[in-house]
Amino acid sequence: MSIQPLHPVGLKSQAVNFQLMPPLSLYIHIPWCVRKCPYCDFNSHEAKPVLSLSKGGSLPEKEYVAALLRDLESALPRVWGRRVQSVFFGGGTPSLVSGEGIAEILRQVRMLLPLEHNAEITLEANPGTVEADKFAAFRAAGVNRLSLGIQSFNDQHLRALGRIHSAGEAKRAIAIAQQHFDNLNLDLMYALPQQTLEQALQDVQTALEYSPQHLSCYHLTLEPNTLFAHQPPLLPDDDASSAMQQGIEALLAGQGYAHYETSAFARPKKQSRHNLNYWQFGDYLGIGAGAHSKLSFHDKVIRQARYKQPQAYLDAAVQGMPVQSEQVLSKEDIAFEFMMNALRLNNGFEEVLFQERTSLPLLLIRHELDEAEKRGLLQRDGQRIAPTELGQRFLNDLLQIFLAPEH
């Protein structure tokens, strides 16, 4: 599907004029990992040998932390005075960084930005790169939410995914994490190579034995420019993967997890605040190699991208010039991107949120909304707009309504 912004009648005559700035989050990218997974299309680069610098490893932690902080300093004029509600360390594998490195980053973040006192601070970790003392150090540094990339508890499937950890290591990592964190997310994947419905449900059942506060269950997709795209494995067909999805949703609903976004399930009040800000079209400042930003001003919305290659980023960041590209979003882009994000939420969004986050009147997409409702993909009650169950199942078809015709 070619994604183009929508072009509703009258949109071009509307001016962007924000009266209230959206909530702001901070994303920090750590680009290194132990081994690139064959399905991964994120900006990640293998670091060999993977040891901490104190043990003679190759990860340039000290230099990268300095570059991140210089990056943040250079971005301050764009976010001056705005409070940060969440911080997210993503990758790559952020848990490759030492506890001291994470602590230094967060120390400087607190000095440079007004961080909310109850800010959600998440760090992604892989079971194969964690030790008990590291978890304790991350918690002491100020991280209050851990996201573990489990993917599966089946050793055969872990090998097929190119993961470096075993099922036993995954279980050990969860047990250690729960000694230090009371807000834990587990990432799982389904529709894996040669996976059966029973195996997919068993992965979720095993995760439930630990009662995590949050579960993310992702359908494996073959992304361009990945090893799996070039050498596709044998995957379950559409009917089988759909049965897995429905079975997972039913199992988690029965255990009290709210299915609040396409792939996200949470205990009450344990939704990912950081990701919710993305889906509700909030602002985010991204620092680090390849990080993206979306920032609103009174008269415009901009997107930025940092240099992707770690060395290019390091060289540019220390000079205070980490941004490789920047664009001002058109009003068409703003309206479309809001819908593309907000319609991922199962409960949708309040109508007033559209104008708050885009500065555009909802009236401008009334024809698209009418069409989606007529096709049974969308429901409205005068206050809230949300995808129907059919719209959730066929989200791409729903989004297609808000895309411009291809030329």
Give the location of each predicted region.
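A short, conserved structural fragment
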Residues: 374-383
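Minor-groove-contacting beta-hairpin "wing" of winged helix-turn-helix DNA-binding domains
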Residues: 384-388
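Short, amphipathic alpha-helical interaction segments positioned at domain boundaries
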Residues: 390-407
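Local cysteine-cluster metal-coordination motifs and their immediate loop/turn environment
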Residues: 31-44
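Short amphipathic alpha-helical interaction segments
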Residues: 359-371
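Conserved N-terminal Rossmann-fold NAD(P)-binding element of oxidoreductases
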Residues: 28
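C-terminal scaffold of the Radical SAM
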Residues: 18-25, 42-78, 82-360
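Flexible, acidic/Gly-rich N-terminal and inter-domain linker regions that tether
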Residues: 1-24, 34
